[in-house]
Amino acid sequence: MSRILNFRAISNGALILLFLLLCHCSLVDAQALEPIGIFDHHQDVGNPKLKGSVVYDKENQTYTMAGAGKNMWATEDQFHFLWKKIKGDFIIRATIRFIGKGTADHRKIGIIARDNLNTDSRYADACVHGDILSSLQYRAKDGDSTYQVVVSSYHPTEIELERIGNTFTFSAAVFGEPYKSVSKEVALNEEVYAGLFICSHLEDVVEKAVFSNVQIIIPPPKNFVPYRDYIGSHLEIMDIETGHRKILHSAPNSLQAPNWTPDNKFLIFNSLSPKENLLYKYELATGAITKLNTGFANQNNNDHVLSYDGKMIAISNHVGEKRTSTIFMLPITGSDNPTKITSELNGHSYLHSWSPDNKKLVFTGQRNNEWNIVSVDIDTKKETILTEDATLDDGPECSPDGKYIYFNSVRTGTMQLWRMKPDGSDEEQVTFDEYNNWFPHFSPDGKWILYVAFPKDIDPTSHPFYKKIYLRLMPAAGGIPKTIGYVYGGQGTINVPSWSPDSKKIAFVSNSKLELGK
C-alpha cells in the first residue's frame, strides 16, 4: 500500500513539474517572440561570443542593430538576426548605413532568408561588406560551403532581396542611382526566416548599423486580375533630399494618388471599395482620416487635383452604365452637388492639372477615337484639343509659371516625358532613357519635376499595378534625373500632384499584401 502511495506521489509530482515546465516554456516563448517593428523576433545565430541587440525607433521607423560573430561564410554562420517567418514570394528592402569606421573590412550587414535558425542552415542573402564587396551569398545545402555572386555596386545604400519561387535576386544601388542586380537559384523551404542581419567578422567586436525605409512586400498571387483584384496599400511621405520615408497609414484595400493640400494640413487620397470609390482626408497633425463629401459623385478614380490656391478640388468620377470618366469640381470643404465640367457624351476625361490662374483644367481625353491632351475652360466648358497624335498622350501638368504643359507620350515607342506651349505648339521631348516615364509633377517652387519610371519590359501604353518602379527627380531647368524612390507600386502611386507646399517632401502610395489587424 505504501509503495502504491509513493508511486502515486511521485507520479503526481512529476506531472506537476511537467506542467510547470510547460508553462515556463510557453511564457518564455511568448516573451521571446514579442514583435519589433514589422518583425517577429531578433536573436543571435551560431552563439557568438558577444550578444547582439536591436533598437526600434517608432517615430522614424528605423532599426539600429548591434552584433558580433566570427563570420557568415564557409559551413557555418554567426550573426545577429531580426526576422519574420514568410511563406512564398516576397521582397524585403532597406536603406542601410554602418555606424563608424568599423574594425574588419568584412563586417557585414544586409537581408537574409534561411530555412532555419541553425548555424549551418541553407540560405540566400543580400550582403554588403565594410569594404567595396557586395554579393548574393548562398548555401545550397545544410552544412555545405558558402558561395557568392558579386553585384557591381560599391558601398550601396539601397538594397533589396526578392524571392520568386526558388530564384533570389539581390538589387543594390547608391541613393540616386538605379539598381544593379544579380540572381541565383537556391532551393529553400516555402516558409523561411527572413529579415535583417549584422555580423562583425570578429568574435571580440560588436558592430552597429542603421536600417531605415525597411519594408516587407508580399506581391499579389500570380492569378490576380488587374482592376478586379487588389492588395494592400501604404500611404507614405518622403524627404526628397535624403530619401527617408515614413509610412503614415496602411490599409488592406487599394488606396491611391494622394494630393498634399497647400495649407500643409491634409493629404487627400481615393480609396476603393466594392460599392464606392471615395475620397478621404488624412490629417497630418493627428493621423485622423475623414471622408471628403463629393455628393452623388461616389465613383471617383485616382485623378483628382487641387486648385493652386487650395480652395477647390476637381475630380474624375465614373458616370452611367458605361462608367465614363467625367470631370467635376467642388469646394475643398466638400459638396453634395459637384459642378460638372466635361460631358460624358464627349468620351472619357481623366483630370491631371489646373492652369496656374485656376481658369482652366487640363486632362487626358478620349476624343475622336484618340487619347490626347485636352484643356477645358471652367466657365464656358469649351474644350481645346492640344495634341493630335495617333498614339497615347497622357499625364499633362502645367508648369507653375504657366509657360509649358508637360505630359507623357508613347509616340517614340517608349513612354517618355514631353512638353509644349499652353496652346499645344512647340512640342519637344524631355526624357530619352530606357524606362517608361509617366506623370510629371512640378514642385511648388518650380525647380523640380517628379515622375514615375516603370520598367522597360511593360506595355508602354500601360501603367500597371504592382511593379518595381522608381520615383525619379529631374531639374525643371534640365539635367540628369536621379532616382529617389525604390518603390513597389505603379498605378495609383503618384498619378496626381503630391508635393508638400515647401517643395521638400512628396506623398505617394506603395503596395503589399497586408495582414488584417497588423
Question: What role is predicted for each listed range?
Answer:
Residues 1-32:
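Bacterial Sec-dependent N-terminal signal peptides
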Residues 31-224:
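Extracellular glycan-recognition regions
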Residues 26-27, 61, 469-471:
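Short beta-strand/loop turn elements enriched in aromatics
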Residues 23-25, 127, 199, 398:
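Generic recognition of cysteine residues
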Residues 220-518:
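Sequence signature of WD/YWTD-type beta-propeller architectures
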